[in-house]
């Protein structure tokens, strides 16, 4: 028994190690190609700084609090816009998923609005809300709202009709049907929407800050670009990527914890 459990434990460890190696192969290749291009002179360090210079800049900006301050400002904007998008998107998504009249009423208009690129909303929102926080929060809301809404509607609509019939047989009221049948069925799809919405909102806030802001990681990158401080630009890009990956992993973990019945699928 002891040898069997030890073998299984080692086997699981090896599988996880292979998965990890598989995941980091491409990033390692990119870093090596970057180093090769700058060290051999294949690319000018004026347009592509050496990776050692970028890492030194990253260390310096983390040390003096510049980078953490910028990221903190951007994340605070996301917290407001994303939270609002999640609440409105899920509530309206549930309504549209469970009510055909509501679905027909909203869907055409929402589909049309979804086709408008986020970047096109920025000047309009600046006109409406000014260059302050409200315009950035509105951009984030619009970016995150539709992925959450669409995936919530999809999850509700894909609920097994047999389960709905069972609910009717047991005379479950509307709230009981929602909590015991529709919600468990829709949660995996809802979390897909939450994940997509968070990813898009992170990109949206960076883009909005580049166009109309005096603070945040997007502003810092654009400001450094105008001053030709390219190591700062690349340090900011790396920070954006790292924070984005952390947020993606966090929402994936929360999704797995909230939908344990999906583990075996």
Predicted stretch roles:
Residues 7-38:
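N-terminal signal-anchor/first transmembrane alpha helix
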Residues 10, 16, 40-83:
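Periplasmic/extracellular loop-to-transmembrane helix junction in inner-membrane transport proteins
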Residues 25, 30, 68, 72-96, ...:
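Hydrophobic alpha-helical transmembrane segments of multipass integral membrane proteins
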Residues 69-77, 127-148, 186, 191, ...:
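Loop-to-helix entry region at the N-terminal start of transmembrane alpha-helices
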Residues 91-127, 140, 150-154, 165:
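Cytoplasmic-entry segments and transmembrane alpha-helices of multi-pass inner-membrane transporters
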Residues 100, 234-265:
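C-terminal transmembrane helix and the adjacent membrane-cytosol boundary/short C-terminal tail
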Residues 138, 142, 175-207, 235, ...:
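Transmembrane alpha-helices
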Residues 155-193, 221:
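Short cytoplasmic-facing helical segments at TM-TM junctions of multi-pass membrane proteins
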């Amino acid at each position: 028994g002891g040898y069997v459990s030890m073998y299984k434990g080692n086997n699981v460890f090896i599988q996880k190690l292979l998965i990890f190696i598989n995941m980091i192969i491409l990033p390692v290749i990119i870093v090596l190609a970057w180093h090769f291009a700058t060290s051999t002179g294949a690319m000018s360090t004026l347009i592509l700084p050496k990776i050692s210079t970028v890492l030194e800049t990253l260390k310096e900006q983390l040390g003096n609090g510049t980078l953490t301050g910028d990221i903190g400002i951007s994340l605070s904007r996301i917290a407001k816009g994303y939270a609002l998008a999640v609440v409105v998107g899920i509530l309206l998504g549930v309504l549209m998923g469970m009510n055909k009249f509501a679905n027909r009423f909203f869907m055409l208009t929402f589909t049309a609005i979804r086709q408008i690129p986020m970047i096109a909303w920025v000047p309009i929102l600046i006109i409406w809300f000014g260059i302050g926080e409200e315009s950035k929060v509105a951009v984030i809301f619009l970016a995150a709202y539709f992925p959450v809404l669409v995936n919530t509607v999809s999850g509700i609509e894909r609920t097994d009709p047999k389960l709905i019939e069972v609910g009717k047989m047991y005379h479950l009221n509307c709230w009981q049907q929602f909590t015991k049948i529709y919600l468990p069925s829709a949660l995996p799809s809802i979390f897909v929407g939450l994940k997509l919405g968070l990813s898009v909102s992170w990109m949206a806030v960076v883009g909005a800050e580049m166009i109309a802001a005096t603070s945040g990681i997007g502003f810092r990158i654009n400001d450094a670009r105008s001053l030709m401080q390219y190591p700062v630009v690349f340090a900011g890009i790396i920070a954006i990527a790292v924070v984005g990956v952390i947020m993606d992993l966090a929402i994936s973990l929360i999704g797995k914890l909230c939908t344990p019945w999906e583990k075996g699928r």
